[in-house]
Curated annotation (Swiss-Prot):
Lineage: Bacteria, Bacillati, Bacillota, Clostridia, Eubacteriales
Annotated GO CC locations: cytoplasm
Keyword hit for Kinase: yes
Location in or out of the cell: Cytoplasm
Major localization class: cytoplasm
Protein species of origin: Desulfitobacterium hafniense (strain DSM 10664 / DCB-2)
Protein known as: Homoserine kinase
């Protein structure tokens, strides 16, 4: 039997569109063991809409890895514990992919390194800023160069908490991507480039007072505001209530605030109240940055 724990992730971190992501201490668990017949058992907080057959993304990812290494696809039973909210911008798809790949690799004898698994994960997912932190942990920088991914950990365990405010509605990545413009101005490109550099500096050297400016964005948050009522106001409310920085998590609708532990409660309540004023109910998760990434447990 093999069990793997996979963290949630927050991608597009601040200005780091499609390149910066963060692993969070909210986990899905994949368990695989030999069986007489194929079956999938689902458990956890979020099971609705998760396929319990061979179309399941965890299983498809497993088969992808086994085929890549020439390992005969076995007859197994899977137990999938789903605690990451799906279609909310917290990396549920990446967790399924990475969890399936890591579990399949371990089941086959651990023949691939994490860097090799990362390449397969990116080919399946297409967004390295989600799969890299899910696999490696911490805050990661990931870029695609000539069809391969280069990923490095910017900081494995920053000394702040991550407050994820999760509105009670689904938002698909495809719908959220469709509102983005085909091109941007030079001014907006420079704005994001400079703040991405500032964000990396703030994280590496733990200069958290720089996060307020370092997490500002012009490439996707304003464009997606129409899909998340109260987004702009809630991002500002987080800062006004004492957060170091705030951003849309992934493609949304989850909103992320980086906070000190002693300010977490007041920031959380202010953000939930802000969304409520726009007719949305939301659940707050107070999380730490996961430093390990996907792990066999």
């Amino acid at each position: 039997m093999v069990r793997v724990r996979i963290p949630a992730t927050s991608a597009n971190l601040g200005p780091g569109f499609d390149c910066l992501g963060m692993a969070l201490s909210l986990y899905n668990v994949v368990q695989i063991e030999a069986a007489d017949s194929f079956q999938i058992a689902l458990k956890g907080d979020y099971t609705a809409g998760i396929p319990g057959d061979e179309t399941n993304l965890v299983w498809q990812s497993m088969c992808n890895l086994w085929e890549a290494i020439g390992f005969e696809i076995p007859t197994v039973s899977l137990e999938l514990e789903n605690n990451i909210p799906p279609t909310r911008g917290m990396g549920s798809s990446s967790a399924a992919i990475v969890g399936g790949l890591v579990a399949a690799n371990e089941y086959a004898g651990g023949v691939l390194s994490k860097q090799q698994i990362l390449q397969i994960a990116n080919r399946i997912e297409g967004h390295p800023d989600n799969v890299a932190p899910a696999l490696l942990g911490g805050v990661t920088l990931a870029v695609t160069a000539e069809a391969s991914v280069i990923a490095r950990t910017v900081h494995s365990q920053p000394q702040f908490m991550a407050l994820a405010i999760v509105p009670d509605f689904y938002l698909s990545t495809e719908k959220s991507r469709n509102v983005l413009p085909a091109s941007i101005s030079r001014a907006d490109a420079v704005y994001n480039l400079s703040r991405t550099a500032l964000l990396v500096e703030a994280l590496i050297h733990e200069n958290y007072e720089l996060l307020k400016e370092g997490m500002q964005d012009r490439l996707h948050q304003n464009q997606r505001a129409s899909l998340v009522p109260g987004l702009g106001e809630t991002l500002q409310v987080a800062l006004d209530s004492g957060a170091y920085g705030s951003a849309l998590s992934g493609s949304g609708p989850t909103i992320l605030a980086l906070v000190s532990s002693h300010r977490a409660e007041q920031v959380s309540q202010a953000m939930v109240d802000s969304l409520a004023a726009h007719g949305l109910t939301a659940k707050a998760y107070l999380l730490s940055v996961d430093s390990e990434g996907a792990a066999v447990i």
